[in-house]
Amino acid sequence: MKVAILESIIMPAGHEVEFDRILVDELVQQGHEPVMLVPEKFPFKIKYNAKTDYLDGGEVVTYAGANKFEKLFLSIKREYRRKKWFDSAYQKSIENNYDAIIIPTSTYRYIRSLLKTDLKNSNIPVYMIFHGINPHEKDNFVKQARKCMPYKNIHLKVITLRDDFKNDGLTNVDLIAPPVFKPLDLPVDKELTLKEPLTLGFFGQYRREKNVRFFLDAFKKAKFNIPVKLIMQGATARTEDSEEFDKIISEYSDVPGVEFWHKNLIGPEWQKALLGVDVIIAPYAAERYRYHWSAMSFTAIGFYKPILQSPEMNPEVLEHFNVGEALALDSVDKFTKQLEKFVNEYPDKRAKYKDDLAKANDIFSHERLIKSLIG
């Protein structure tokens, strides 16, 4: 099949870019011909293994650097162009003989726009992907999904581990599992080889409101039976955050086994850092991650790393797979005891983590994603 991936969002390098790469590479793997279908002058962040077709209707509209009032104007402009792109996609599908169109990052606004364009009458399947629907969005999503039901070639695919639509009677909505994120061209230790010291990796952007001292105090107090190392990365964007992280480094410089990385990790460097630890600590997650899939959680699975994670972060994963634990964040003492127990029992539980990471990688595979999208 010739499958067009209609991408109209300019994204920084991150999991959105990687999601498009997953689609392209797995479509190729399964014998399809992917095509990137994008607005004119689209600034690709990476090179995809696909040819590119361009939409009529103008360039991508971004909010970068815009103030509150400018964003209001730009949102209207973006909506107008989105409808132009969808009309153009309808024409391109005929001219270029596409067999299907995938819109990889959609919202209810995309459905609303699509219903005002020729694309709703597409003769080929149009698969709109939604990366989770939170309670605040649900009513709007259901309203637009119902309006879309008469158009039988428009398929709404919600990536989720929940079932929040069972009573809504939406025959055009399918719930599909998220895919894992895997390293590119780097070996993965699927055996979870036991090494000394056991290395815990705490990665991410640091902001002053994040209470990393909580975790450092717990690590400092913990009594471990095996050698342990904690790598704490702090990627900082603001001067005040950078100064505060430097202060933390100074305060905890005498704690044995703690290594601070005050730097950004991008691309291969990020992947090597994740592959270089034994366990990932991901303590921060907003409530929305109960409804939207967490890139960090599915990166840990794809990299075969057990995870100590925020309780809000896709709890269904830990309910079905023994790949880590939800963090006890009530107090430093409580987390200290959890950390001690987790680390000290790791050598004995490693085999179970290994088995369940393999099972999770199968359930959340790229192959299953494409088959759940286009059959």
Give the positions of each predicted feature:
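Nucleotide-sugar-dependent
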Residues: 282-298, 310-312, 316-317
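Nucleotide-activated donor-binding/catalytic signature segment of Leloir-type glycosyltransferases, i.e.
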Residues: 243-271
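Conserved donor-binding/catalytic core segment of Leloir-type glycosyltransferases
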Residues: 191-210, 216-221, 230-231
